[in-house]
Amino acid sequence: MGNVLAASSPAPPAAGSPPAPGLVSVPPGFTMPPVAGLTPTPDKKETQEDRLPNPGTFEECHRKCKELFPIQMEGVKLTVNKGLSNYFQVNHTVSLSMIGESNYHFGATYVGTKQLGPAEAFPVLVGDLDNSGSLNAQIIHQVTSNVRSKIALQTQQSKFVNWQLDTEYRGEDFTAAVTLGNPDILVGSGILVAHYLQSITPSLALGGELVYHRRPGEEGTVMSLAGRYTAPNWTATLTLGQAGAHATYYHKANDQLQVGVEFEASTRMQDTSVSFGYQLDLPKANLLFKGSVDSNWIVGATLEKKLPPLPLTLAMGAFLNHKKNKFQCGFGLTIG
């Protein structure tokens, strides 16, 4: 929910996980007592452990469960990644399909020198251009320690199709975000999305989403409320709104096995569905297996196999729709 563009592009890794508290020998505001036997005063300052964590973003509420489900594959796909420097990388992707159109994509990623963590550096520029001239591009930058902004553009051949501007503010125990999509002052159209997520306790986070859209002859607002409870090895999330309901449950059985259940109900489509997915990770064998089955009797599975010391990753996927008696499979190879 809240995604204005249909274009997909990689997002920065681990952007939604809350920062771990720093390890300090003495809590902030305290000094070592000069002699033994002294006890802290009742009006001591709040320690790092007493503070509520940042809950992440609203869009990441269901992500942990949805990442367990396999991505549908069809045809043959070859991807070649090449790092030109520590900051710049390009990739070439060729897809051959029996159902859709075969295509070629050229992608480029630039990561700046503003290091904020082991896996985060800004600004980030991501672009993808296909053989028809259509472009998907994103620019992500950490303006301050709390404010992050993103600009996304999508063109179809020589015409602008979509563009959006995101601004996100992360406080100590809350995250607020505003997205403006396809604004047109002359026509009087556009989409405005506002998100807010607040940590109530270390385990419970509550928030909401407000979507306002306007175009000639049509104007409307859709509101949704969300709650997420996080335990040491499971997470439950529920979103309720005028558009329907969305609930997910994620459970980590052990270091190798993770399972998830997803429920979706749409008031517009008058349809409900339940999906079950799991992920099996075997690091010693360099294998990653994902499987799923839903209430529409669609069964799918993907298998990824890394071939060290070569920079190769093999991927195979198969999906069977029992109701429509339709089967499709795919094979992928990633180099680099």
Swiss-Prot record:
A UniProt-annotated Pfam family? Porin_3
Which superkingdom does the taxonomy of this entry point to? Eukaryota
Q: Where in the cell is it found?
A: Mitochondrion outer membrane
**Annotated GO CC locations:** mitochondrial outer membrane; pore complex
Name the InterPro entries for this protein: Porin_dom_sf, Porin_Euk/Tom40, Tom40
Record's compositionally biased regions (Pro residues): 10-21
- What name does this protein carry? Mitochondrial import receptor subunit TOM40 homolog
Q: Where is this region: Disordered?
A: 1-58
Q: Which PANTHER family match?
A: MITOCHONDRIAL IMPORT RECEPTOR SUBUNIT TOM40
Instruction: State whether it acts alone or in a complex, and with which partners, per the record.
Output: Forms part of the preprotein translocase complex of the outer mitochondrial membrane (TOM complex). Interacts with mitochondrial targeting sequences.
What species is this protein from? Answer: Xenopus tropicalis (Western clawed frog)
Per its database record, what is this protein's job?
Answer: Channel-forming protein essential for import of protein precursors into mitochondria.
